[in-house]
């Protein structure tokens, strides 16, 4: 249901919000600055170590945990997320998070050369290298966003550096990162086709140094459709898409450039391509909802966290191989383990309930910010996503 106020806050109203929220920013109360989202997570209880839900990759028979660890937000020594902070990554805490995750059956870890300001792969590699190589699947990306990395030589150098940082001699899941961004197909061709990089990656898969090759999709639907139209040629092993109970039917109401997850998932499903799910919480917004929505969710399932509803939605589709969550803090990991150990799939009535919830969320006069931070840094020193997220709350 469209909300015109949602899209068209007038300049005066926005500046009022900006000024008020900027004051809160200085007091370090903003979710974009530091937020453990404590209200979304229940107290720690015993979590079984042998009840993780797994899915089978049809092309490789990999037995993949339905909860995947997104490594974009590793904690820093200042107890912030390394996505936002330049402080040193707290490797000891990263190791502990990985230990708890693996002990409870998580075996899929998703990183990128771009994550944590270029430090995620190294921290992830240090933590995982303490385990036998067959205990985990590592997913990383060819994140050649900058034109300076579009040459064949620069892109291949980035690819080889991932092996070094991750301390591995093969990559389980390699993604073309963020296809559809920027100028759509023109940019995709410059990054992967005109320079011969996709041909190189296909050869690497043939040689066994890449076990599964896919892409993560953002933005221009023409690129998504084009790549699937060439599936017989490229034989995509998986595709990473944004899927949550708002984007399922209302993606364009959140961001006009987005496409409904119902369509994206459906196109993958009819081709038998496994889906990897990103943004199950819509940039954290589905774990930090309006108080009225929180009460509604708690009334239906009092013992469950607000976030668990979104994760159960994403995990309930049979074509989903794993659902990614960027877990900075132990309480986030613990809550997600409760959700997936094992997963309690949604009923049809539950899905209808969440569709009603999505429509209610869209009626609130919010600004469509996913905390991606592509608008940062601000030349005036403002925490733009923090301000917008504070307004939304």
What residues fall within each predicted segment?
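CE4/NodB-like, metal-dependent polysaccharide N-deacetylase domain
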Residues: 154-175, 203-207
């Amino acid at each position: 249901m469209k909300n015109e106020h949602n899209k068209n806050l007038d300049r005066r109203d926005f500046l009022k919000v900006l000024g008020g929220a900027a004051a809160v920013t200085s007091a370090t109360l903003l979710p974009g600055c530091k937020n453990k989202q404590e209200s979304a997570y229940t107290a720690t209880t015993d979590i079984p170590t042998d009840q993780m839900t797994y899915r089978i990759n049809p092309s490789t028979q990999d037995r993949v945990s339905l909860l995947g660890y997104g490594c974009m937000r590793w904690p820093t020594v200042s107890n912030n997320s390394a996505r936002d902070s330049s402080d040193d990554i707290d490797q000891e805490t990263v190791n502990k998070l990985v230990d708890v995750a693996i002990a409870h059956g998580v075996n899929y870890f998703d990183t990128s050369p771009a994550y944590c300001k270029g430090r995620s792969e190294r921290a992830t590699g240090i933590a995982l290298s303490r385990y036998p190589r067959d205990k985990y699947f590592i997913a990383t990306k060819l994140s050649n966003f900058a034109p300076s990395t579009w040459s064949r030589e620069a892109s291949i150098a980035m690819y080889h550096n991932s092996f070094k940082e991750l301390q591995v001699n093969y990559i389980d899941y390699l993604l073309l990162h963020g296809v559809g961004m920027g100028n759509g197909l023109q940019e995709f061709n410059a990054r992967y086709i005109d320079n011969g990089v996709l041909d190189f990656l296909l050869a690497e898969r043939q040689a066994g140094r890449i076990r599964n090759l896919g892409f993560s999709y953002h933005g221009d639907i023409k690129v998504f459709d084009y790549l699937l139209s060439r599936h017989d040629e490229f034989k995509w092993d998986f595709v990473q898409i944004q899927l949550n109970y708002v984007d399922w039917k209302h993606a364009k109401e959140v961001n006009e450039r987005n496409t409904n997850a119902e369509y994206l998932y459906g196109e993958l499903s009819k081709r038998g391509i496994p889906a990897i799910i990103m943004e199950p919480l819509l940039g954290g917004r589905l774990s930090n909802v309006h108080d009225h929505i929180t009460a509604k969710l708690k009334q239906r399932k009092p013992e469950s966290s607000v976030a668990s509803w979104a994760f159960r939605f994403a995990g309930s589709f049979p074509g989903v191989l794993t659902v990614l969550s960027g877990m900075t803090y132990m309480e986030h990991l613990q809550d997600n383990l409760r959700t997936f150990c094992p997963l309690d799939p949604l009923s049809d009535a539950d899905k209808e309930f969440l569709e009603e919830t999505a429509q209610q969320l869209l009626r609130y006069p919010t600004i469509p910010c996913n905390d991606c931070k592509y608008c940062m840094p601000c030349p005036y020193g403002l925490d733009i996503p923090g301000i917008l997220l504070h307004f939304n709350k």
